[in-house]
Regions:
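Glycine-rich nucleotide phosphate-binding loop and flanking beta-alpha elements
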Residues: 8-10, 43
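Short hydrophobic core segments
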Residues: 1-6, 29, 167-170
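Short secondary-structure transition/capping segments
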Residues: 48-53, 148-150, 180
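An anion/pyrophosphate-binding glycine-rich loop and adjacent beta-alpha core
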Residues: 28, 34-140, 192, 201-207
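Long, amphipathic alpha-helical stalk/connector segments used for oligomerization, subunit docking
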Residues: 204-220
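A glycine-rich dinucleotide-binding beta-alpha-beta segment and adjacent secondary-structure elements
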Residues: 120-173
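A conserved FAD-binding loop/helix module that cradles the flavin
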Residues: 11-32, 163, 175-202
Length: 220
């Protein structure tokens, strides 16, 4: 049996996950005495597009800030170095929101050429337009949102849990590769790499054979 029930974003007011992801696999595992690990390892992304509409939050990538977009408070003032790590920027935004009694801050693209916005960030541009904000002319409201769950059902390097013949893959699992704060674009490790390792183990592939093939593919 393989558990692949995703993360826990549906438990949060703002999340880039689908609302249906509510940690069901964790609940099943806990009820059967399967070990869970690092349930407090939750990554919050600093900039999701603020919206009063229910459902999944739209993520505005760090690359926008890398191109020159800056965070502003309600007075139009910068309050943080936008290129600091996600958790640091998130904390700064939360602090500013609390200070101002606001439910969002602003992301200004004023320093980003319009051509760059349209060519490099067309999806962001279109999503902001849907909410009524033309980021070539005005800032867009943003708010931190739950983005990734590094904790989960404890698994080994073949995605085996502490229960015989039970595996967990993807975001519902915790194999330790992400530590406490996942690096951007690394989520496929659990979804693809460790899922493939689990499939190999289930199929009866010998550990030594698998490791040999793995080493050859990586280093040969």
């Amino acid at each position: 049996t393989v558990l692949a029930t995703g993360g826990i974003g549906g438990l949060y007011k703002h999340s880039t996950n689908f609302p249906s992801l509510t940690g069901d696999g964790l609940d099943v595992a806990k009820k059967h005495g399967v070990r869970l690990e690092h349930l407090d390892y939750v990554q919050i992304h600093p900039t999701s597009l603020y919206s009063k509409k229910p459902g999944r939050s739209f993520l505005i990538s760090e690359s926008a800030r890398g191109e020159g977009a800056v965070l502003l408070n309600g007075k139009g003032e910068r309050f943080v170095d936008e290129l600091l790590p996600r958790d640091v920027v998130t904390q700064a935004i939360e602090k500013e929101m609390e200070k101002e009694g606001s439910d969002h801050v602003w992301l200004s693209f004023k320093a980003v050429p319009e051509e760059t916005i349209r060519n490099h960030f067309p999806h962001i541009y279109e999503e902001c337009l849907k909410e009524g904000y033309d980021i070539t002319k005005e800032p867009a409201p943003v708010v931190p949102a739950q983005h990734y769950f590094m904790g989960g059902i404890y698994v080994d390097h073949f995605s085996e849990t502490t229960m015989d013949h039970l595996y967990a893959v993807g975001e519902t699992s915790c194999n330790g590769v992400h530590g406490k704060n996942r690096l951007a674009s690394n989520s496929l490790l659990e979804s693809l790499v460790f899922a493939e390792r689990a499939a190999g183990k289930i199929a009866g592939r010998e550990d030594e054979e698998y490791e040999s093939n793995y080493d050859a593919a990586c280093c040969g």
